[in-house]
């Protein structure tokens, strides 16, 4: 991780984002992505090495935990912040949920209670109403768009307008789409 951090910085990276949220089997099978939610000590070794090697801010993306029996995102977030991570994004599902069911935005709020750095909520932000509800339920400082933006390149502008009226764009009508 330290070497990758140095290489990324040499190529001009403005931040280093550690992705511990990927649920794909080909990623988690090698103790990467959200599989790191099963071994927080190992995850912290990687986070600490990255922060130590970084001259730019380090951010972290994770899920709520591996499964509903290990909802350890608040603990990992607290430890990551103490190690120097500057922003944390939480996807409101466990790894075992993949993308099924609904994201649990209120569970993201438990991470908000554990940290002081900016918190970004992720998962099921597919409408302006969802974005408002996600922010309200999670207490997050912002949202990260994912699958909800597929095929809708204007979606970030709509969310910007929602958060700061007049700064973004309005959602296009069906005719405009």
Locate the predicted segments by residue.
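Surface-exposed beta-strand edges and their flanking turn/coil or helix-capping segments
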Residues: 4-6, 103, 134
